[in-house]
From Swiss-Prot:
Record-level Gene Ontology MF annotations: zinc ion binding
Keyword Isomerase: no
Name assigned to this protein: BTB/POZ domain and ankyrin repeat-containing protein NPR1
Location(s) in or outside the cell: Cytoplasm; Nucleus; Nucleus, Nuclear body
Location of the BTB domain: 63-139
Length: 586
């Protein structure tokens, strides 16, 4: 299994039939009858261990070049890489790379890859094999998912990690590793979901692994993956093979199966092309000219899978699509959006009535799909204050909260009942609240604002001449009172919807903001003027407030961990905030 904690494998790989998802056999015996390794094997093992120290021991850092992977420099020894890899041998002959620290060459991983991707952890596993001849187990944090009942033997993160290793082995010209990973990918093909076979087929095509291509093409041709998904995710040459094989299988199973209506298919594809062009007006025109409906074209599914969130908003605004409609594979638009892992589209669909409890034909909910696609590294990643939270984590949080609550009630407009003076005060309060949310929880605030169609200026104290709402309150001599009142009410409703969305999907963040605004914000206003001593008190108090935000988040996170549920991760680390005890002002 990918996360098994076992020793590294032996120096000989190709003869070992015992392949697992994360490591291979490490028996040093030359035959079953020998109980003691030979002196030669012991010497090679010691050499391997000594070379490994060059990678793992900080005291043995004698590297002479850096390869930057995902923004992280990895020190390497060019002589070792050149002796083991024809790719690096030719690279170091041809160029010296850009100058780094102490004039050592620096290379960027993305410059090496004509296709595919090789992540930081995958490169470290590859590098360890180059140095030691031993293949390490796959790191748990990048080769498993966060679904609590998954065996991790063929989930998407497990497959993706081996795919990355295959790209590294093929591009860097390590044929023995290619053979190992090809067998491992072949093992995946029979166990994985059909959608998860697509990345395997793609790497097989790029690396010209014919046996693996044939196995994948056969598996995909027998699946229910639609032609559009294939055309979007695979090269034309491969798609053509799949379609031919699929037609043959269909004719064998049902010779009387009527062919698809080409005119009907053409009209549907025209609607999809209009969505690709972000032209919803053209979509409306095509619907008028033909007898095709949005649901027949699965337009909402298509937009959720491939289009900008603004296009999804416009399609929903037409009011012609069933938000819980299932496509031919039994997926709703929410299931498709979850596979894409786009939080804004997920929240859009939920606010329009999409049911998170809907199950696919194989019994998976939206949150189950999302968890099977998410790596522990991404789910548990820590985010500094002011940085955006990980999208995978936000998607899971939103869906789990939706599963635990009643569907959100419709937006009842109460802004029309607010008097003019109260309207300005309410606008000021909401503008400042949303601005504070952007400061403390930027990713969550941005998501709520996008759905509510709200934009706000940065937070400013009431001493500002224009207020925190910027030009919103300014008097326009060309604007009639009626128009101004309509504009302010529209703004108020957008801000109120932003706050409601925050309370609905990010309740812990909202609680922190409530406490900050009720208990602490007035004190900051009173301290705005004053002597230097008062300014020092204000700065000290602000640091204490930052600590309270962290403590509140840690408390929520601990409670969620105990119950197996998750909370928002957009905050800063306690080490960078300061003391652990909050001092109340007298």
């Amino acid at each position: 299994m990918a996360h098994s904690a076992e020793p590294s494998s032996s120096l000989s790989f190709t003869s070992s039939p015992h392949l697992s998802n994360g490591s291979i056999s490490h028996n040093l015996s030359c035959s079953g009858s020998e109980s003691v390794p030979s002196l030669e094997v012991i010497s090679l093992s010691k050499l391997s261990s000594s070379l490994e120290q060059l990678l793992i021991d900080p005291g043995c850092d004698y590297s002479d070049a850096d390869i930057v992977v995902e923004g992280i420099p990895v020190g390497v020894h060019r002589c070792i890489l050149a002796s083991r890899s024809g790719f690096f041998r030719e690279l170091f002959k041809r160029e010296k790379g850009s100058s780094g620290k102490e004039d050592r060459p620096k290379y960027c991983m993305s410059d090496f890859l004509p296709y595919g991707d090789v992540g930081y952890e995958a490169f470290l596993v590859f590098l360890s094999y180059v140095y030691t001849g031993k293949l390490k187990p796959s790191p748990v944090e990048v080769s498993t998912c966060v679904h609590n009942v998954c065996a991790h033997d063929a989930c998407r993160p497990a497959i993706n990690f081996v795919v990355e290793l295959m790209y590294a082995a093929s591009i860097f010209q390590m044929p023995d590793l290619v053979s190992i990973f090809e067998r491992r990918l072949l093992n995946f093909v029979g166990k994985a979901l059909s959608d998860n076979v697509v990345p395997i087929l793609l790497v097989a095509f790029h690396c010209q692994l014919n046996q693996l291509i044939d196995q994948c093409v056969d598996r995909v041709a027998r699946s229910d993956i639609d032609d559009i998904s294939l055309e979007k995710g695979l090269p034309d040459e491969v798609v053509k093979k799949i379609k031919i094989l699929r037609r043959n299988y269909q004719q064998d199973s049902d010779p009387n199966l009527p062919p698809a209506d080409p005119l009907h298919e053409k009209r549907i594809r025209r609607i999809h092309k209009a969505l690709d062009s972000d032209d919803v007006e053209l979509v409306k025109l095509l619907l008028t000219e033909s007898n095709i409906t949005l649901d027949e074209a699965n337009a909402l599914h298509y937009a959720a899978a491939y289009c900008d969130p603004k296009v999804v908003t416009e399609v929903l605004a037409l009011g012609l699509a069933d938000v819980n409609l299932r496509n031919s594979r039994g997926y709703t638009a929410l299931h498709i959006a979850v596979m894409r892992k786009e939080p804004s589209i997920i929240v859009l669909l939920l606010t329009k009535g999409a049911r998170a409890s809907e199950l696919t034909s194989d019994g998976q909910s939206a949150v189950s799909i999302c968890r099977r696609l998410t790596r522990p590294k991404d789910y548990h990643s820590k985010t500094e204050q002011g940085q955006e939270a990980n999208k995978d984590r936000i998607c899971i949080d939103v869906l789990e909260r939706e599963m635990r609550r009643n569907p959100m009630a419709g937006d009842a407009s109460i802004s029309s009942q607010i008097m003019p003076d109260d309207l300005h005060m309410e606008l000021l309060n909401l503008e400042n609240r949303v601005a504070l949310a952007r400061l403390f929880f930027p990713a969550e605030a941005k998501l709520a604002m996008v759905i509510a169609h709200a934009e706000t200026s940065e937070f400013a104290a009431p001493s500002s001449s224009k207020g925190s709402s910027g030009n919103l309150m300014e008097v326009d001599l060309n604007e009639t009172p009626t128009v101004q009142n309509k504009r302010l009410h529209s703004r108020l409703e957008a801000l109120m919807k932003t706050v409601r969305l925050g309370r609905c999907y990010f309740p812990h963040c909202s609680e922190v903001l409530d406490k900050f605004i009720d208990d602490d914000l007035p004190h900051l206003f009173y301290l705005e003027p004053g002597s230097s001593d008062e300014q020092k008190v204000k700065r000290r108090r602000f640091m204490e407030l930052k600590e309270e935000v962290q403590k509140a988040f840690d408390k929520d996170k601990a409670e969620c961990n105990l119950s197996g549920l998750s909370s928002s991760s957009s905050t800063t680390s306690p080490e960078k905030i300061g003391a652990n005890q909050k001092v109340r002002e007298p």
